[in-house]
Structure formats: structure tokens, C-alpha cells
């Protein structure tokens, strides 16, 4: 019962991670955020690997999944620091999320709750193929939305890491006990004896 509850809980957290990652991937595509798009894709693959390892009792896959979650927590912590401009990070100077290929910002910058977008015409700050806009009235600014999204990812990843370690430990213990009992013992297996068909012939002796 304990093993089933642990596996079921891990699968549930993996499904939540998958839904959250797909939702985030959609909004990152809309905002042309190439670095998060790549990271989200790798995360989706790792979560699918974790689900497969849980269902198929593959402890190695769960270990790989848990190792990825450590990197995932670090990435999301960096995103929080980036959008909140911790230390020397600056959104106006660093365009890490787009690999410095464009000036696009988060999709939530213009489409956040209550945001009113006003184009600024004939602005000297406008670059070629770009336009300047003014965003006002947002109930929650986009840096905080991105930070909350990353915080949710960290929360799910921490719980997923704990349950992945627990379930993989259970799987490894079961494998060890199976070996100890003799699951792979050659002496526990006896080959079926081949039956031979012999024809009896009468024996004649000379008197």
C-alpha cells in the first residue's frame, strides 16, 4: 500500500509538472523567449521520463529525473532573480531570454491582467522594425507573474524530487531483496528432463 501511494503521488506530481510546463511553454512561445522554450522542452522530456520510470519500475530513470530537477530548480531561481533584477541583472540591458536575438519581452508585459497598451508614435527610442509602447494599469506587473510562475515550478520540483528519491529507493530495495531470495539464482531453476521413448525388444537365448 505504501509503495502504491508513493508511486501514485509521484505520478500525480509529474502530471502537474507536465501541465504547468506546457502552459508555460505556450506563453514563452507567444513572447519569443527562446531560452525558456529550450529549458521547458528539456523539462517536459525529463518529466515524461519520470512518469515512465515510475510506471515501469525503472529506478535509473527516476534517478535521472531527480538529477534534472536539481538543475530545473537552479534555472527557475535564476529566472526569479532575472525578472526581479537581483544584483547586476537588468532586463533593459540583458536579453538572455531571447539569446540576444531580439528585444522581445515576456508575453505578460502587454497581456497581463488589467494592462492597457498604448503605442508611442514617432518615438526617438524606436529601433528599426520595432515600436515603442506604454503599458499602464496592470494589476500585477509581468516580472512578478514570471517570478510566481517560476516559484510554482520550484515548489513542484522539490516535491517531485523528494518522491522520486523515495520511490527509486523502494525500487532498489525490491531489486536487492529479489536477488537475495534467488530471483536470478540458477540453482532455483531446474530444466525439464527430456523423456526418451525406448522400444522394448524380447531377448532370445539359445538353449
From Swiss-Prot:
Residues that span the membrane, as ranges: 2-22, 35-55, 62-82, 147-167
Compartments (UniProt record): Cell membrane
Domain of life per record: Eukaryota
Membrane topology designation: Multi-pass membrane protein
Keywords assigned: Cell membrane, Glycoprotein, Membrane, Transmembrane, Transmembrane helix
GO terms assigned for molecular function: ATPase binding
Pfam family, one: NKAIN
Tissue: Detected in the brain only and specifically in neurons. Expressed in multiple regions such as cerebral cortex, thalamus, hippocampus, olfactory bulb and brainstem as well as in cerebellum with high expression in granular cell layer.
The keyword Oxidoreductase is assigned to this record: no
GO cellular component, one term: plasma membrane
Coiled-coil region: none
Residues carrying sugar: 100
Similarity comment: family membership: Belongs to the NKAIN family.
Quaternary assembly: Interacts with ATP1B1 C-terminus.
Name of the protein in its database record: Sodium/potassium-transporting ATPase subunit beta-1-interacting protein 1
Organism annotation: Mus musculus (Mouse)
